Amino acid sequence: MTENALLLLNLGSPDSTRVEDVRRYLDQFLMDPYVVDLPWPLRRLLVSLILVKRPAESAHAYSSIWWDEGSPLIVLSRRLQEAIKPHWPHGPVELAMRYGQPAIEKVLLDLARRGIRRVTLAPLYPQFADSTTTTAEQEVRRVIAAHRLELEVSTLPPFYDQPVYLDALVESVHPYLQQPHDHLLLSFHGLPERHIRKLVKDPAHDLLAESSRNVSPEALALCYRSQCLRTAEAFAERAGLEQGRWSVSFQSRLGRAKWIEPYTDAKLDELVQRGVKRLLVMCPAFVADCIETLEEIGMRGREQFISAGGEDLVLIPCLNDHPAWVGALADMSGRLARPL
C-alpha cells in the first residue's frame, strides 16, 4: 500500500532569540504578499522601515518566553507530531513551518527522496485566512512545481466548526472553567479588514457584527472574523457558558490600517471598567502556545489588566498536545482532507 505522509503545517519561529535571527524571520514573514498585501516596492520599503526597530523589540519578547529546548511553538509542535504518530498508521508524520525551520521545501524534498508519493497537509489554523492557510498551501504548490515532484497532495480545510475540534477545546479548557472567575475572554489573532474585504465582495457584510448567525454561507466560507465568532459561539454553547460571562476580541494588530474589532487591549480595559476582577483568557486561533499567547497575553496582557484594576488574568494553554486534540486532528486529517 502506498504510504500517505501527514504533514503538519504551522507559521514558524526564529531560530533563536538573537536579533539577527529574529530580523531574518521577520523579513521572510512580512515580505510574504499574503501577509503584507502591498505591491513589492511598497512592501519592501515598509518592511525595511519596520526592521529598523522591530527585531530588537521582538527579540526581547522572544527571550522572555523562550524555553531551554527552544521556541515554545516549535517544541510544542514537535510534541504534537510525536503524539499523533500512533493515530496515523498511513505513513510518516512530519512537521514544517511556513517561515523559518523546518522549511516546507526541505521537508517535501525529503519526503520525495524517501519515496513518499502521497501527502496529507494539516494546516494548523482552525479559521481561514489568506495570510495563514492560503500562503502555506501556495508554498507547497510552488515547491512541487519548482522541483517537479510527483506528489499527490490533499489538505485539511479550516475546521473552525468541526465537532471534534470544538469538543477538544471544551475538554482542554474545562479544568480552568472550574476555577473561580468572573469572565472568559476568547482572544483571536487579528487581521486587517481589507484582507477580508478582498475576499468577501458583499458590501452589506458586517465586520462589526456581534454574532455569526446571520452570515451567509458564502461569506462565512471566506470571512475569518465570522469563522472566529462561529467557533466562539459553538464553544460557549458546548461548554455551557452563561450569556454575558464570555466575550470575543482580536489581538496582535500591526501598523495603522484598520483591523477587525473589538481589539483585545481595549477589551481588557473595558472588562475592568465593567467590574471584572478575575479574568480567564483563551486563544482559539492558535493550536500551540507561542509568542502571541505566552508574551502578548500571558505577560503584557496580564500586566495591563492588573494595572487597570483587575486582580488576576489567567492564560489558558492552547490545545498543544492535549490527547483530545491529538485524536481530533488525526480524525479530521483522515476524514476531511480534499485534493489541493
From Swiss-Prot:
Function: Catalyzes the ferrous insertion into protoporphyrin IX.
Pfam families tied to this protein: Ferrochelatase (PF00762)
Assigned EC number: 4.98.1.1
Keywords: Cytoplasm, Heme biosynthesis, Iron, Lyase, Metal-binding, Porphyrin biosynthesis
Enzyme class: lyase
Residue numbers binding Fe cation: H189, E292
Gene3D superfamilies: 3.40.50.1400
InterPro entries with a match to the protein in the record: Ferrochelatase (IPR001015), Ferrochelatase_C (IPR033644), Ferrochelatase_N (IPR033659)
Subcellular location: Cytoplasm
HAMAP family assigned to the protein according to its UniProt record, in alphabetical order: Ferrochelatase (MF_00323)
Family note: Belongs to the ferrochelatase family.
UniProt-recorded name of the protein: Ferrochelatase
Taxonomic source organism: Pseudomonas paraeruginosa (strain DSM 24068 / PA7)
Any one cellular-component term (Gene Ontology): cytoplasm
Gene Ontology molecular function, alphabetical: ferrochelatase activity; metal ion binding
Pathway field: Porphyrin-containing compound metabolism; protoheme biosynthesis; protoheme from protoporphyrin-IX: step 1/1
Record field: catalytic activity: heme b + 2 H(+) = protoporphyrin IX + Fe(2+)
Keyword Membrane: no
GO biological process terms on file: heme biosynthetic process
